[in-house]
Amino acid sequence: VGGSSGECIYQHPDERKAVLEAVMSEAKGKITVIAHVACNNTADSVELAAHAEKCGVDAIASIPPIYFHLPNYAIADYWNAMSAAAPNTEFIIYNIPQLAGTALTMPLLNEMLKNPNVIAVKNSSMPTQDIQMFKDAGIQARGADGFAVFNGPDEQFVSGRVMGADGGIGG
């Protein structure tokens, strides 16, 4: 809820909260609900993460901060701040470098795998080989069942599955 298809970047945090509340009133306990909580600043992202946990989502997800190319440690701090605001909720890294301007690197993924709430990557990068690299890193850190990689673009679903994606989160 509230990801790329939901035009999250263009909505005010209050609008995003209202949408999530409406979705949860209908879907909670019936389907898996993942709330995208990224904003252009950490404070709003943290606020949305805490709200999502309060609403009872199954997981939160986030792209990296957009526009400026930040070092890995700054992106990790941004994501970990959101995760800390929702300590009982799983966290999914959303890799979409063609729109976010920053790609998930292996050093950044390995740093994020130190956070036990990080359970998956949604990969929307064009090289489907990234799926295999992310999956291998997750298996190495968490074991075969402890980490998932989801394919993003619908048109790459089959090739993503061939590369090891556990499923897809399309738009």
Regions found by a protein language model. Name each.
Residues V1-A103:
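Active-site beta->alpha loop and helix N-cap motifs at the rims of alpha/beta catalytic domains
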Residues A84-P87, P97-G171:
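Catalytic alpha/beta core domains of metabolic enzymes, predominantly
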